[in-house]
């Protein structure tokens, strides 16, 4: 069954990417998901095929299931959110469960965390903070210069890689620029860079404009997408 799904979803010879945003606050509309837009722009610059974005709440079972689905249809899954110390931060645990892997503590991360938080914590054995040091055994750790929650790059199965980032935009961007961008260029980038131009019209309805340029809209090269404002 899995092999059939892989044949169905993964395009032969193409590297495909999905973005998964985790956090109930996104689904409730409490915050605007700017991370996905920013990452999508970076993927376009790198020439990668990016076909799908998903947002999901802080539920262990649903996160695990969506990660398993993504593993069948894309080569690179970029995840933001759910890396913090609180009980609803479930991303790494869900990833491990999705591939039946154990988590181990990276002790050096705990030492680094204590250095960052020397004047901010009193309990040096804080189990909530230690949670952020737990990763699959073979995961490559992405340093977080702006926060305490590291990310990771991990390949749990053949032709499928997961990257995790904190949900805080400034932390995610710093980690992307410092580590992830170079890794993606070296391992995933293709020559499919999309060049785009914006043409603005005023004083005409969207339907009238569509009729006037119908031959262009129906073409595949270039792809034309009207946006009413």
Please name every model-derived segment.
Residues 52-62:
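Short beta->alpha junction loops
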Residues 24-25, 82-85, 167-170:
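Short glycine-rich anion-binding loops that position phosphate/pyrophosphate groups of nucleotides
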Residues 65, 89-188:
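Proline/glycine-rich low-complexity loops and linkers
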Residues 157-229:
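An accessory alpha-helical subdomain
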Residues 65-73:
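Short, well-structured alpha-helical segments in soluble
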Residues 9-53:
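Glycine-rich phosphate/diphosphate-binding loop of Rossmann-like nucleotide-binding domains
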Residues 72-99:
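Glycine-rich phosphate-binding loop
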Residues 1-14, 219:
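N-terminal, positively charged, Ser/Thr/Ala/Gly-biased leader segments
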């Amino acid at each position: 069954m899995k092999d059939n799904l892989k044949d169905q979803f993964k395009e032969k010879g193409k590297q495909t990417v999905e973005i998964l945003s985790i956090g109930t606050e996104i689904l409730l509309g409490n915050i605007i998901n700017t991370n996905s837009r920013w990452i999508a722009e970076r993927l376009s610059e790198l020439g990668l095929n990016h076909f799908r974005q998903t947002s999901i709440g802080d539920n262990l079972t649903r996160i695990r299931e969506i990660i398993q689905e993504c593993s069948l249809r894309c080569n690179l899954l970029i995840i933001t959110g759910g890396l913090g110390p609180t009980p609803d931060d479930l991303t790494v645990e869900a990833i491990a469960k999705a591939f039946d892997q154990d988590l181990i503590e990276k002790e050096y991360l705990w030492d680094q965390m204590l250095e960052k938080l020397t004047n901010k914590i009193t309990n040096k054995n804080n189990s909530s903070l230690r949670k952020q040091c737990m990763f699959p055994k073979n995961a490559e750790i992405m340093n977080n210069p702006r926060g305490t929650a590291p990310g990771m790059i991990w390949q749990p199965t053949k032709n499928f890689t997961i990257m995790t980032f904190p949900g805080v935009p400034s932390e995610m961007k710093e980690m992307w620029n410092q580590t992830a961008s170079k890794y993606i260029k070296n391992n995933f980038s293709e020559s499919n860079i999309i060049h785009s131009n914006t043409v603005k019209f005023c004083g005409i309805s969207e339907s009238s404009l569509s009729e006037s340029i119908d031959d262009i809209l129906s073409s595949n090269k270039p792809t034309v997408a009207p946006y009413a404002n």
